[in-house]
A protein has these predicted regions:
Chain A
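Residue-level signature of catalytic and energy-coupling elements of molecular machines
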Residues: 1, 43, 88, 170, ...
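Soluble-to-membrane junctions at the N-terminal ends of transmembrane alpha-helices
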Residues: 31-47, 104-119, 140-143
Length: 206, 206
């Protein structure tokens, strides 16, 4: 979350590296780019991120019934949302590095990696939930959510910086983007799968 | 979350900058440091982070009653936990930069900034929760949690890299540390304040 200051740092590192090749004796005037130590910019970032991330509360609110009936799902929300941010962040960094080196970036390739990661992460998330006396159906939902979140995160984490790069925007900004997107998408995926696996069968049974 | 790969990148950027001064014609053999594109290291990182972040589910599980009686608190968990990661991450980056430039880093100074940030973030979190038809007492808990989380995040985000630096460990690793710590601390703070504000008064009233 809020990797803006880090990506800014990366930008500058990248730019200073580029500068290095042209004229190593003349580094960028870095001090002029620094603003995080000022109260205004720092506070503005925090306010913006808080408001965007609060969208997650709207989604959860609209699935209030599901969450009340299956409390265990809420216990694993932070873990699952974190997984999306982590896996997506990894893909962004890999993509930014490959683009910087002029290497080709293929979403299909990262989708393949995402599917391989699912083979480890989904069973792990399921076992972790089941170990905590979580009912089988809810543990399976946690595992399935881990699978969908991992695949989505690797795709978004690759496609987003590639898209930014295509539109001449620094792909490093994808680091913030993927964290915010996967925070909200993660919540939506858990709620959606919860409805599909835990609520729908009960409705059909009636 | 999982900023390890980013801080690694920063480390290398820093090291290459240092190298620049000594011998600009001989950059570090960067390729040898790269491992994130390999399945093993990437998956190991994700597994480790998932297991650490799953501690949050144990805390929530032990406050199950509170969460069931005050569902609105769970809706704002992702937003509040995100705030801790964001504010803490900002402090880490500021501290790492100051240490790199040989400037003094004072936890007291960041505590002061944290208290100023609280003046904006706590009312904002309260209003955001209250706007969503959250009961007044729960909205106040969300606001109070935002306050405590913001102050904790700025302190931990400053003290952790300073501590790492003191023990000759790269302070940049504080970026991962603060995210994981504030994920878990954030959940604990919301649960603790929820118990204090929403459960204790009811017990005394009996």
């Amino acid at each position: 979350m809020a990797l803006g200051f880090l990506t800014d740092r990366l930008d500058r590192a990248d730019r200073s590296e580029a500068k290095e090749v042209e004229a190593p004796q003349a580094p960028l005037p870095r001090e002029s780019l620094e603003s995080l130590h000022l109260f205004g910019p720092r506070c503005t970032w925090l306010v913006a991120m808080l408001l965007v991330q609060s969208v997650s509360s709207l989604i959860l609110d609209s699935f209030k019934g599901l969450m009340q009936r299956h409390m265990s799902l809420t216990f694993f929300l932070t873990m699952l949302v974190g997984l999306g941010g982590n896996a997506g962040g990894q893909s962004v960094v890999l993509t930014v590095r490959r683009l910087a080196l002029g290497k080709p970036v293929q979403v299909k390739e990262q989708l393949h990696v995402g599917l391989l990661l699912v083979l480890v992460m989904a069973p792990l998330a399921f076992v972790r939930a089941y170990m905590q006396q979580t009912p089988l159906s809810e543990s399976l939902t946690v595992g399935a959510a881990a699978a969908v979140i991992t695949v989505c995160a690797t795709i978004v984490g690759t496609a987003l910086p590639k898209l930014l790069w295509f539109f001449n925007v620094d792909p490093a900004h994808g680091a913030v983007g993927v964290q915010v997107l996967m925070d909200i998408a993660g919540i939506a995926i858990v709620c959606g799968l919860g409805y599909l696996f835990l609520e729908l069968p009960a409705k059909f049974a009636k």
